[in-house]
UniProtKB/Swiss-Prot annotation:
This is Probable glycosyltransferase 6. One of its GO terms (molecular function) is galactosyltransferase activity. Pfam families: Glyco_transf_34. It is found in: Golgi apparatus membrane. Residues 62-483 are lumenal. The gene is GT6. Belongs to the glycosyltransferase 34 family. It comes from Oryza sativa subsp. indica. It is an enzyme of class 2 (transferase).
């Protein structure tokens, strides 16, 4: 019923009821109260119906705005129930917040800025204490009440705002984004995807620093912020970050100590994926890192310094990766001591070393599940997606016991490569580095994305027809024993 229909109904019912009740009052005093109750109920029903219709209409006429900063919650809820669900979760764990929340926090301090302001004196100070004070106010029962003691992680990724120049580039970016959404959903990680240039002069690979810094302030409840380049693919959906391994460190980067600290090679690490703790050390570090970028008046000088200092650097451009190597090697005690160069697994693997091995790796996992044992039969059981982590742990144990080699998931490990990074392929720009062909990049990206997607689709009873096909087929019962 439309809202315009309910209003006349309410008015006419009231006016007619008024005359009827007056006559009833004179003749039948006992019926007067019943008549008023009846009319009140009719009016109330009409009013409620009108409000519900107006709300429903408003939801269609005023859809939620789409911004260029998109956040994905780790636990999906329907749009209609988002506020109610969040309020219920907050109430369950004793979260205190909202516009009228008591107590001032760093958000009320006008001197605290989300922006990277290169060259400006000051910056955020006392962040550890400010963050702790915010959490005491907002989480009086403790932050980890809903996360089984896990440290919270926010993943940040992003791409450019304009459409891609390369043919099919936007479609590839969508597939890369889907891959990250899938991983985050399976592992309880929140994803923030940004395509706004938060600092106009910090272009290209430098744009990650303002995004990560802003995420730290927007998510003080997150212990870690995890930057992942747009062209990086999660190729092991079972793997969870070993955060306990980094308890004494504030920055985790894929790299090698010898190449960074001994040889000072500009390719001794890769800055396309990194994990950084939400703390004062990290804010100070990113300020120092940003001062070597294009927003700095000394940008050209830093390019010359990096060229003269780092082994193998042929150009005089100050890029984020070279700057990171310089900071760690030049200030090893200040920055290097709290940085973990991860090489025990493919925190980000070079795609050329990975994609040709994916078929063999998939066969290795399937062989472990086809073994004639009760444990393998248990792994083949169909299950709900929310049970993924339990099955992942059991599957890793089965493969580890069946396949020789280290546990890392690197070039010789038994594990799937965790992240495969298509550095140099430039899927959005359309022109890969001259050392790669377009076909090798296209096939490699498609193969890696399908390899990862098969791990997700299995929970839904499907897989890709072949490693390079978009077509999917249903899985037989008791897969992979039945093929």
């Amino acid at each position: 019923m439309a809202a315009s229909e309910t209003a006349p109904f309410g008015v006419s019912a009231a006016s007619k009821g008024g005359g009827g009740v007056a006559g009833a009052r004179a003749q039948h005093g006992q019926l007067a109260v019943a008549g008023r109750v009846h009319d009140a109920l009719v009016f109330a029903a009409g009013a409620v119906a009108a409000v519900l219709v107006l709300l429903a209409t408003a939801s269609f006429l005023s859809p939620m705005p789409v911004t260029n900063l998109v956040a994905f919650r780790s636990l999906p809820v329907s749009v209609a129930s988002t506020s109610a669900a969040s309020a219920a979760i907050d109430a369950d764990v004793g979260v205190r917040g909202g516009p009228g929340a008591a107590g001032r926090t760093f958000y009320d301090d006008s001197r605290v800025s989300y922006a990277v302001e290169v060259g400006r004196r000051g910056g955020i100070t006392g962040w550890d204490a400010r963050r702790a004070a915010w959490m005491r106010l907002r989480y009086p029962r403790g932050l980890n009440a809903t996360a089984a003691g896990r440290e919270r992680v926010v993943m940040v990724s992003g791409s450019q705002a304009p459409p891609c120049r390369g043919e099919g580039g936007d479609h590839l970016l969508l597939r890369f984004l889907k891959n990250k959404v899938d991983y985050c959903r399976l592992h309880g990680v929140e994803l923030l995807y940004n395509n706004a240039l938060l600092q106009p002069r910090m272009l290209a690979y430098w744009a990650k620093i303002p995004a990560v810094r802003a995420a730290m302030l927007a998510h003080p409840d997150a212990e870690w912020v995890w930057w992942v380049d747009a062209d990086a693919v999660f190729t092991d959906m079972d793997f969870s970050l070993p955060l306990h391994k980094y308890k004494d460190h504030n920055l985790v980067v894929y790299g090698w100590n010898k190449e960074v600290y001994g040889e000072r090679s500009w390719v001794g690490l890769n800055a396309g994926v990194f994990l950084i703790r939400n703390c004062q050390w990290s804010l100070d570090f990113m300020d120092s890192w940003a001062r070597m970028g294009p927003a700095s008046p000394e940008y050209a000088r830093w390019g010359s310094v990096l060229h003269d200092t780092l082994r193998g650097k042929s150009d005089k451009e100050s890029d984020d990766q070279s700057a990171l190597v310089y900071l760690l090697s030049e200030h090893e005690e200040k920055w290097g001591a709290k940085t973990y160069l991860e090489k025990g697994y493919f925190f980000q693997g070079y795609w050329v070393e990975v994609v040709d091995r994916l078929d063999d790796i998939a066969a290795r996992y399937e062989a472990a599940e086809r073994r004639p044992s009760a444990a393998a039969a248990h792994l083949r059981r169909r299950h709900a997606e929310r049970e993924h982590e339990r099955y992942a742990a059991a599957r890793n144990a089965a493969v580890r016991g069946a396949v020789p080699g280290p546990a890392g998931g690197g070039q010789s490990g038994w594990r799937r490569p965790f992240v495969t990074h298509f550095t140099g392929c430039q899927p959005c720009g359309g022109e890969p580095n001259k050392i790669y062909s377009k076909k090798s990049c296209a096939d490699g990206m498609n193969r890696a994305l399908n390899f990862a997607d098969d791990q997700v689709l299995r929970n839904y009873g499907y897989r890709h027809k072949d490693p390079l096909s978009d077509e999917v087929r249903p899985l037989p019962f008791d897969y992979p024993a039945a093929r």
